[in-house]
């Protein structure tokens, strides 16, 4: 089974959840959830699972739980497939 690690730059507390594009090798995502008690992390996992059409359990936070720069493991997709699904402007 394929899996990859995705770098994400998170902006919590935004007015809405939004994919903002690529910043080098990281994708920038704005989330409406606040960075309190793991809410932004949960919102990020749910947002990416929906965008990538994967079950929630296929998206796992592996690094950066308390930081804005995060790394997530995506099971079942290669990095190329993830980039294609999220948009290739990066």
Write out the residue ranges for each language-model feature:
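Contiguous, often N-terminal, cationic amphipathic patches that form binding interfaces
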Residues: 1-46, 53-56, 60-66, 70-90
């Amino acid at each position: 089974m394929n899996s990859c690690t995705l770098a994400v730059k998170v902006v919590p507390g935004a007015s809405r959840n939004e994919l903002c594009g690529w910043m080098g090798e990281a994708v920038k995502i704005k989330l409406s959830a606040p960075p309190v008690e793991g809410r932004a992390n949960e919102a990020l996992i749910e947002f990416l699972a929906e965008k990538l059409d994967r079950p929630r359990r296929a998206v796992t936070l592996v690094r950066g739980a308390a930081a804005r720069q995060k790394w997530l493991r995506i099971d079942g997709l290669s990095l190329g497939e993830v980039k294609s699904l999220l948009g290739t402007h990066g």
